[in-house]
Every structure is written in structure tokens, then in C-alpha cells.
């Protein structure tokens, strides 16, 4: 690390929609500042997971410190990378809190998109210096002037200092570095001498335990200090080492001082001990007040995860435990189901978070799993005045005890070309949405603001939006309040027995169509038996939809050659009684494929 000068430090972040070139620009900045040698360079260097590279998204934020010579001075540039997806908006807000500036990357051909819009507003709330960067300027479809106008009119940013660049060719990269130094303010020197450091991320290392990523706001942190976390109060830990991101995490001598970004290790073993947004201070000279903005991360979407082969239960438990080491937002609780056996009820930040965890389980641990339909947290107000919060149909109380139910709603911004307006309005109406306002983004695109129930978003909203807009629509959402809703428990009965794995909480208006579609799907995937199998959807014991799997026909009179009809009648009568007995005592074996198909449909 170079000699410390707070006026030569620049802490900045990169804000971009998925696939607008954030990771590629980060690669070019690392190359231009010689932070990494050419022979060690690879694409999307800061995206360490294979999944991040394949999907072209940032899941886990990765900071890096670069040094750059400008006008005879050496500057320390700290890039605090952020995940772009709406599921991780709290992590984004904490990463932005560690910065004084941000690069807003916009695709010069596609223009402003919903998720970059959401993160820009977070940056504006924190009063960060935002530098607009128009990427992919080398594309034939690039319209830099039109996109600048869009940014000015819709976001309200001055684009006179906007930089046209191409991460692919390297054009404009030196200008970006110079703009960071000229426009992003250095950290403000603090009058306080007590240590205050903001935790913006953490990482589990099997050798040293939890590495806590911090931006020092005041004071300094060094090896040997005894520190504590201000939200948990009580526990204290000795700092065993401090480090910087060069670009890999590297232990350094000395201390991390006000304005600097780095990490420390303190023999921490559980990621739950380290909360993003918390304030670190010393035990000897503690800070009087913690930094603002800390809140506990709470899961929003829940689903049950079960191994297809019950003997894989311990492997699944181990897999989830390991994933949780680097993901404090993932919650795990053991549960059992009559149909699926032993498994886990898991909480996620959103649908992308859920998909990533599922994919990592099957990929990194080679496990075949079944996941139940995603659910949200419903609020149940009982007649005796008590309030319950439930995320699982099995926890649904007796309907006679319920006063009313409430469901979480979200504020949604949708950006779409004008020609798809009617399609989107139909989709949102089908999803019980309320239109708040419609704004023009430019000559061809609109921004629609809606309120929608979260339950409608977590099912298939993204897929349907992409479908009705031919892939051009994008959206982001933020949580709103709970509102009363006619939420009921839909049960599926197979041969008059309830199968808990197919039960779900739905809005009354959608119960019949949902029940019918599940019954129709089950008729296709459950093999016929020697007796008729009724498949029914029920609400509070009342059947609302029914399908029947016809019995396999067995010719019991095949051995009778002509002769008296009474002999045949006796055999048919005997078969009839046998089928009746089988229906009463026979068990319908539901293949795993049936669970997979129905839950995929949900």
C-alpha cells in the first residue's frame, strides 16, 4: 500500500443493469491501472463464481483497490462492486454508503433500464457524485445523444461530463479514471478519533474464518485491537490481521485508516455474527453512536427443499450449511412432509436468490432436489386479537378462527417500448395490479408504476413480462405495506387423501383456475392403477375442481370360452368387489416426476 493521504483516496461504485457491461468495464480499469498483470487477466475477473460468468450477473459484491498516477500524484481508487439485481438492494445500499461516487453505466444502444434506475435512486439518496458512462459506443445501434437526453430528462443528471466508452475496445477508459479523480470527492476527514467502520460485506474462508469487509469512517483499525459490533453489543473479538484487495485479499502491515477500504480477520466462525450495515468499533475507545441505515436482512420468499432420494438428506443439510457460510440472508429450518419426507424450509431475498441457491446445490454438490412452490409471508389476524405470520400452507390456522388475512404488496417500475403497453396492462390486471402512473422515458419507451401483490411477482411475473414484451421489458420492485386480501388454503386430494406437498395459499379469485390446472396436470403425470383415482382441489373441505384417472382395464373373462353368461357375470361381480376394496385400502404411489412437474408449473 502507498503512503496514506486521505485527499488522494477515491471510493466509488458501479451501477448498471444486467448485461450493460459493468464487469467488463471493471476488467478494463484493472488493466489500465496495472492492478493485475496481462497474463493473469481473464474476463469478468471480479465475478468469482462460474454461475456469475455464465449468467453475466454479479451475485456477490467484490471490492478491489487500484493505484493510479495522475498529474504527479498517486491516487488510491477503491472500487466497491455491487450486485445489480433488485433482490440484493440492501447490499447495494450498504455498498453505496461506503462510497462518495458512482459510475452509472448505460448501454448506448438500449438506454436506461429498470434495475439501473432503482440503484441510481439509492445513490442519489446518499448524495453521491454520479458520473454517467455510455458503454458499447462502438455498436452500430448506439445513440449517445438520445441516451444522454434520456438520462437528463428522466433521472435529472447533468450529462455534460458523460463519458462515451467501449469496454470491448478500451476506448474511454483513461477518461473514466481521470473523471473519478477529478469529480468524485475524497472522504471527509472526521473530527472523531474513535474507530467507526461500516461493514459492507463478509466472506467465509475455510482457513481464517470470516473476513469482514469494511470502509473505515473514522479512527483506525490494526492488528491486536479488540473490537465489537455495535448492533449485537456484548461479544468482542481480537483483530488477528488486516488486509486490502490487491485485487485478491492480501494481508498487510500497519493499519486501515479513515477513508480506506479493506478487511480484517478476528477468528469469527459464523457469518450470522457479522451483519451487513453494522458498525465496528473498539472496546477500549468505543464510538458514541453507530452509523445510520443498519437493518436486519429478512427473507421475503420461502420454499421447501427436499432431496429426491431420501438418503441424500445429510448431504443436503451439509450443502445448505456451506452455502449459508457466505450468505447471511439465507435462512434454513428443518421440516418434514408426509409426501416428500424430510427437508428444509428456506428463506430467500427474492426469486433470483432462490434460483441461484437451487442451481448451486445441484451444481456444486451434485444433488437432485425437489422445491415446493415459492411463498411469501402472510399476516393472519385471528378473532381473539392475536396476529400470526405464516409462509407455509401447513401453518394455516382453522378458517373459523380467522378474522382477516393480509398479504405483502410491492411498488413496481416497468420500463417497456410503447407498443407493448396494452400487453403489460393486461398482465398487471391479471396479477391484481393497481396502476399508479405512466411516464414517457423517451420517444419510444414508457415507465409504468404499479402496485402488485408480492405473491404474484414471485411466481412467473418476470417470465410473462419478457414474453409479452418480446424480451424488451424490464422491471424492479421494492417492498411496500401489507394490505387485506382474500387469501385461502387450496388443498389437493388424491384418492380422497390430502397431499400436503401440493397445498398452497392463493387468492380466492384464482383458487378455482389454479386447482383445476393442478388436477389436470396430475392426471397426465400419475400412472393409472387397477382402480379409479379421483383427483380433487378443495377449499375448506369444499371440492372446487375434479379430474379422474381411469382404471386400467383387466379382462377377467378372457379364460371363458362361450358358454353360460352367468359365469361371466360372477367374475365381473367379483372384480367389482375387488376394485371397491382396492379403492378403500389401496395406496396411490405418486412418482417423483409428478411432484417435479406440478411444482415446476406452480
From Swiss-Prot:
It comes from the Bacteria. GTP binds at residues 19-24, 135-138. One of its GO terms (molecular function) is ribosome binding. Its EC number is 3.6.5.n1. Belongs to the TRAFAC class translation factor GTPase superfamily. Classic translation factor GTPase family. LepA subfamily. It holds the Pfam family GTP_EFTU_D2. Residues 7-188 form the tr-type G domain. PANTHER family: TRANSLATION FACTOR GUF1 HOMOLOG, CHLOROPLASTIC (PTHR43512:SF4), TRANSLATION FACTOR GUF1-RELATED (PTHR43512). It catalyses: GTP + H2O = GDP + phosphate + H(+). This is Elongation factor 4. Required for accurate and efficient protein synthesis under certain stress conditions. May act as a fidelity factor of the translation reaction, by catalyzing a one-codon backward translocation of tRNAs on improperly translocated ribosomes. Back-translocation proceeds from a post-translocation (POST) complex to a pre-translocation (PRE) complex, thus giving elongation factor G a second chance to translocate the tRNAs correctly. Binds to ribosomes in a GTP-dependent manner. One of its GO terms (biological process) is positive regulation of translation. It is an enzyme of class 3 (hydrolase).
Amino acid at each position: 500500500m502507498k503512503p496514506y493521504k486521505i485527499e488522494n483516496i477515491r471510493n466509488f461504485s458501479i451501477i448498471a443493469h444486467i448485461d450493460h457491461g459493468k464487469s467488463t468495464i471493471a476488467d478494463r480499469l484493472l488493466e489500465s491501472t496495472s492492478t493485475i498483470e496481462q497474463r493473469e487477466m481473464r474476463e469478468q475477473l471480479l465475478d468469482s463464481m462460474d454461475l456469475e460468468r455464465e449468467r453475466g450477473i454479479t451475485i456477490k459484491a467484490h471490492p478491489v483497490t487500484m493505484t493510479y498516477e495522475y498529474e504527479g500524484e498517486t491516487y488510491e481508487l477503491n472500487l466497491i462492486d455491487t450486485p445489480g439485481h433488485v433482490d440484493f438492494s440492501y447490499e447495494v445500499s450498504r455498498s453505496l454508503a461506503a462510497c462518495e461516487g458512482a459510475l452509472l453505466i448505460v448501454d448506448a444502444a438500449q438506454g436506461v433500464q429498470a434495475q439501473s434506475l432503482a440503484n441510481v435512486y439509492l445513490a442519489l439518496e446518499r448524495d453521491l457524485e454520479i458520473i454517467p458512462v455510455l458503454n458499447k459506443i462502438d455498436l452500430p445501434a448506439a445513440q449517445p445523444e438520445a441516451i444522454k437526453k434520456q438520462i437528463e430528462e428522466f433521472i435529472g443528471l447533468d450529462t455534460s461530463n458523460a463519458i462515451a466508452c467501449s469496454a470491448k475496445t478500451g476506448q474511454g477508459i483513461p477518461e473514466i479514471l481521470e473523471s473519478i479523480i477529478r469529480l468524485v470527492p475524497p472522504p471527509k476527514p472526521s473530527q472523531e478519533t474513535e474507530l467507526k467502520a461500516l461493514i459492507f460485506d463478509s466472506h467465509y474462508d475455510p482457513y481464517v474464518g470470516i473476513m469482514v469487509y469494511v470502509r473505515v469512517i473514522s479512527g483506525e483499525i490494526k492488528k491486536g485491537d479488540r473490537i465489537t459490533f455495535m448492533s449485537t453489543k456484548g461479544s468482542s473479538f481480537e483483530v488477528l490481521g488486516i488486509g486490502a484487495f490487491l485485487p485478491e485479499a492480501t494481508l498487510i502491515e500497519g493499519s486501515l485508516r479513515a477513508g480506506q477500504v479493506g478487511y480484517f480477520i478476528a477468528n469469527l466462525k459464523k457469518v450470522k455474527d457479522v451483519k451487513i450495515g453494522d458498525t465496528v468499533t473498539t472496546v477500549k475507545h468505543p464510538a458514541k453512536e453507530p452509523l445510520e441505515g443498519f437493518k436486519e436482512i429478512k427473507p421475503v420468499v420461502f420454499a421447501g427443499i427436499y432431496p429426491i432420494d431420501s438418503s441424500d438428506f445429510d448431504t443436503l443439510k451439509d450443502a445448505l450449511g456451506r452455502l449459508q457460510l457466505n450468505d447471511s440472508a439465507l435462512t434454513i429450518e428443518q421440516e418434514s412432509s408426509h409426501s416428500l419426507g424430510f427437508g428444509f424450509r428456506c428463506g430467500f431475498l427474492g426469486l433470483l436468490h432462490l434460483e441461484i441457491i437451487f442451481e448451486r446445490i445441484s451444481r456444486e454438490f451434485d444433488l437432485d432436489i425437489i422445491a415446493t412452490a415459492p411463498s411469501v409471508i402472510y399476516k393472519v389476524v385471528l378473532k381473539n386479537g392475536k396476529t400470526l405470520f405464516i409462509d407455509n400452507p401447513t401453518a394455516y390456522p382453522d378458517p373459523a378462527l380467522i378474522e382477516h388475512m393480509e398479504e405483502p404488496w410491492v411498488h413496481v417500475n416497468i420500463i417497456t417500448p410503447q407498443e407493448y403497453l396494452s400487453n403489460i396492462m393486461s398482465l398487471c390486471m391479471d396479477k391484481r395490479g393497481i396502476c399508479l402512473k405512466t411516464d414517457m422515458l423517451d420517444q419510444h419507451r414508457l415507465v409504468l408504476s404499479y402496485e402488485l401483490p408480492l405473491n404474484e411477482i414471485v411466481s412467473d411475473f418476470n417470465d410473462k413480462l419478457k414474453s409479452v414484451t418480446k424480451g424488451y421489458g424490464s422491471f424492479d420492485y421494492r417492498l411496500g405495506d401489507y394490505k387485506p386480501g382474500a387469501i385461502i388454503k387450496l388443498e389437493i386430494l388424491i384418492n380422497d387423501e390430502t397431499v400436503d406437498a401440493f397445498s398452497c395459499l392463493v387468492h380466492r379469485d384464482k383458487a378455482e383456475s389454479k386447482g383445476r390446472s393442478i388436477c389436470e396436470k396430475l392426471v397426465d403425470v400419475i400412472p393409472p392403477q387397477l382402480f379409479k383415482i379421483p383427483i380433487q382441489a378443495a377449499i375448506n373441505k369444499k371440492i372446487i375442481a375434479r379430474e379422474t384417472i381411469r382404471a386400467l382395464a383387466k379382462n377377467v373373462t378372457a379364460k371363458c370360452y362361450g358358454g353360460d353368461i352367468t359365469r361371466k357375470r360372477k367374475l365381473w361381480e367379483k372384480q367389482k368387489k375387488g376394485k371397491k376394496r382396492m379403492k378403500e385400502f389401496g395406496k396411490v404411489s405418486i412418482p417423483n416426476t409428478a411432484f417435479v412437474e406440478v411444482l415446476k408449473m406452480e
